[in-house]
Amino acid sequence: MSSPRDRVNAFYKDNLQFKNTRVVLNKEQLLIERPYMLLAVLFVMFLSLVGLLAIAGIRLHRAAVNTAEINSGLTTSIDITKSIEYQVKDVLTPLFKIIGDEVGLRTPQRFTDLTKFISDKIKFLNPDKEYDFRDINWCISPPERIKINYDQYCAHTAAEELITMLVNSSLAGTSVLPTSLVNLGRSCTGSTTTKGQFSNMSLALSGIYSGRGYNISSMITITEKGMYGSTYLVGKHNQGARRPSTAWQRDYRVFEVGIIRELGLGTPVFHMTNYLELPRQPELEICMLALGEFKLAALCLADNSVALHYGGLRDDHKIRFVKLGVWPSPADSDTLATLSAVDPTLDGLYITTHRGIIAAGKAVWVVPVTRTDDQRKMGQCRREACREKPPPFCNSTDWEPLEAGRIPAYGILTIRLGLADKLKLTIISEFGPLITHDSGMDLYTPLDGNEYWLTIPPLQNSALGTVNTLVLEPSLKISPNILTLPIRSGGGDCYTPTYLSDLADDDVKLSSNLVILPSRNLQYVSATYDTSRVEHAIVYYIYSAGRLSSYYYPVKLPIKGDPVSLQIGCFPWGLKLWCHHFCSVIDSGTRKQVTHTGAVGIEITCNSR
């Protein structure tokens, strides 16, 4: 039997004993197992952190995208709101205010002043006080053997003086600058940049007709020293007709004149101040315009070719003469003009679209004429010009005098605009550089001297335009300036236009008239209807004498088709060159004739190196 001590020891043998017991730890095993556990815990924490960061990044990205979309929408809304506010506040409101002031305040006041001025001047016939008659001396002491209608003459004189005063005050606020101040790149030694600004803002009558959908055609617009003048045919249809079968259209010949103004829009605006609208008649088919001295003058005929004889025109040929002041006055007229005795050598004149000038109380135009002595004086010149590689005009059938073998000369048409002058049209003529087509002749006044610039437009894909000089006093002389070729064997002064090679640019469908800019150095502009681009365009070319290259700027058109006519007019305004165009096109889709008009401001800047 075991002893009690053995039983106690047996009870505690398999139990932990803390007293007097030594525990031996396996340190190597602990050192190996503990890092694995820590790494496992850290890896789990790292994965959790990465997951949280990924979730946070996705949410932040979504929030940023939503915020960007909201900001973009707000920015667009703000821009649209600002644009509308600008249009209403800075453009439309001042424009309507200006129009309202002009129509409601200034124009009636000017007419009131005009009426009062005329009444005061007429009272001199029975004066009740002292008058200063120095400005109308003819009303007091007319020259001998001159019979005038005192009432009419003095009223018209007073009206013209007031018109001059009103126009000068109106033009005083405009920003017309000489072209010499317009940067046309003359001082650039490197490359240049050409920029354009399009504008169709207008206070002209033609703009109102276009807005109403009336058909405008045969439009000619010319500018001169802050004024503009134009003429065109307009077809007015009955807009109140309920059925097309009951609609009708009436055609009118319209003449309008006005001033070019700055209305706070940054662009020049044609502001019509006077107009005349006449029912379309045979003698109003073809018209020539002249502008100057605050007047517009026009000569109109039924046909572009008129046979002449020593006594003047035949009875069936009528010349319609129209004169309009920049402001309406009793001196405005619409009447028939008579042709004074004609030089016996003249037998025909040919009229197209011609630009004339008004200077020294006379309106002057230049047109082609035929003379009976053409073969004797210019026959050798023509034969030599057509001998080797004859240009197209040698066998041309497109123009009546060339088809008949005639050699046209230059005819100067002059009509005096004085109130005491009879409306008689005089013609003098002289030969000069050969005239090879009937695209028109335009006359421009130089800044100094007594020479005039005479331009002949280019002939599309055939001949370049020419710039000649014309001297009226002491004797008529037409001399070549640029773009002509001398014929050495032609004898004397024999020149022809510069004809192009057969490799012409087929993308150029039509050329415009040549416009001389008012500068001391010869500068001129022409335009072409170009189809080389996806959108058809009018391409303006700016030339300066002495430069081998030109500047150009294309104006995209909203229409496409076959061009019928292209007429331009250019003038300096501010630091830009503004050109107005009227283009007629046979639409390629509808095959109907459509028109496009507008103005573009061209600015040429030098690129810094």
Swiss-Prot record:
Entry keyword set: Glycoprotein, Hemagglutinin, Host membrane, Host-virus interaction, Membrane, Signal-anchor, Transmembrane, Transmembrane helix, Viral attachment to host cell, Viral envelope protein, Virion, Virus entry into host cell
Residues spanning the membrane: 35-58
Spans within the Intravirion topological domain: 1-34
Compartmental location: Virion membrane; Host membrane
One cellular-component annotation, GO: virion membrane
Side Virion surface, residues: 59-609
Domain of life: Viruses
Pfam families: HN
Membrane topology field: Single-pass type II membrane protein
GO biological process: symbiont entry into host cell; virion attachment to host cell
InterPro entries (UniProt xref): Hemagglutn/HN (IPR000665), Sialidase_sf (IPR036278)
A molecular-function term among this protein's GO annotations: host cell surface receptor binding
Glycosylation sites: N168, N200, N215, N395
Protein family: Belongs to the paramyxoviruses hemagglutinin-neuraminidase family. Non-sialidase subfamily.
Known function: Attaches the virus to cell receptors and thereby initiating infection. Binding of H protein to the receptor induces a conformational change that allows the F protein to trigger virion/cell membranes fusion. Down-regulates human MCP/CD46 cell surface expression.
Name recorded for this polypeptide: Hemagglutinin glycoprotein
